[in-house]
Amino acid sequence: MPTTNIKELLEAGAHFGHQTSRWHPRMKKYIFTKRNGIHIIDLEKTVVMLDKACNYINQVVSEGGKVLFVGTKKQAQEILAEEAKRCGMYFINQRWTGGILTNFHSIQSRIDYLVRLEDQQARGDFNRLPKKEAQKLAEEIARLNRTMGGFKEMTRLPDVIFVVDPTKEKIAMAEAKRMGVPLVAMVDTNCNPDEVDYPIPSNDDAMRAIKLICSKMADSVIEAQNALKVTEVETTGEAQAETAG
């Protein structure tokens, strides 16, 4: 059964592309028509491509893989964080810090620093410091959490990255390509879909479209996680039965 349908995509405004003057020629196969100087995305293709992307995400998570959700444009920030948290995956919704993938060890040391500060704060160590110093450290925690809070539990490179707008996340895209991390992304009519392993033709500016696609990604993760839990329960049950026997 398809992940979504044309009606759902239409209601989310996923079919509205950019002005025809701003298009990327590689998107031609995903464009249905032009209307009032705007490209209209072929939603039949979107249904198929979204299905492929969701199946891939499901497969990765089924094998114990992790997904990093990336979307730093204003209209995506809150939605992306919400959906990533809902499925227990990592996210970046503020600025992409250069080197997150290509210099992961250095980034990891910053995360370790953040975690140490949070531990000290939780233990009440800040209460023994001068007020100004304690406030400065609390502000440092808040600052680091803004940029790294969504992936501070990430101990290795993600197995796949989901991107809301590739034209906005060029550094993330380049780092993923360099490190061989597969990309799933929403591609509007101004994007090059060839830069993405699993492109999803869609309006990437409308909040409803972003919400719809992000929620489908999260649903695919949750579905795989639930299937893993069932398998673990069955395996445990079989092992206990064998032991009892």
Curated annotation (Swiss-Prot):
Gene3D superfamilies (alphabetical): Glucose-6-phosphate isomerase like protein, domain 1, Helix hairpin bin
One Pfam family of this chain: Ribosomal_S2
Q: Name one GO cellular component term.
A: cytosolic small ribosomal subunit
Q: Note the coiled coil stretches, chain numbering.
A: none
**The organism's place on the tree of life at top rank:** Bacteria
Q: Which GO terms describe its molecular function?
A: structural constituent of ribosome
One biological process term in Gene Ontology: translation
* Keywords, comma-separated and alphabetical: Ribonucleoprotein, Ribosomal protein
The membrane spanning regions, by residue number, are none
The family database entries (CDD domains) matched by this protein are listed as: RPS2 (cd01425)
> SUPFAM superfamilies, from UniProt?
Ribosomal protein S2 (SSF52313)
Q: Which family does it belong to?
A: Belongs to the universal ribosomal protein uS2 family.
NCBIfam families in alphabetical order: rpsB_bact
Could you tell me which PANTHER family the record lists for this protein? Answer: 30S RIBOSOMAL PROTEIN S2 PROKARYOTIC AND ORGANELLAR (PTHR12534), SMALL RIBOSOMAL SUBUNIT PROTEIN US2M (PTHR12534:SF0)
Q: What is this protein called?
A: Small ribosomal subunit protein uS2
- State the species of origin: Dehalococcoides mccartyi (strain ATCC BAA-2266 / KCTC 15142 / 195)
Q: What is the lineage of its organism?
A: Bacteria, Bacillati, Chloroflexota, Dehalococcoidia, Dehalococcoidales
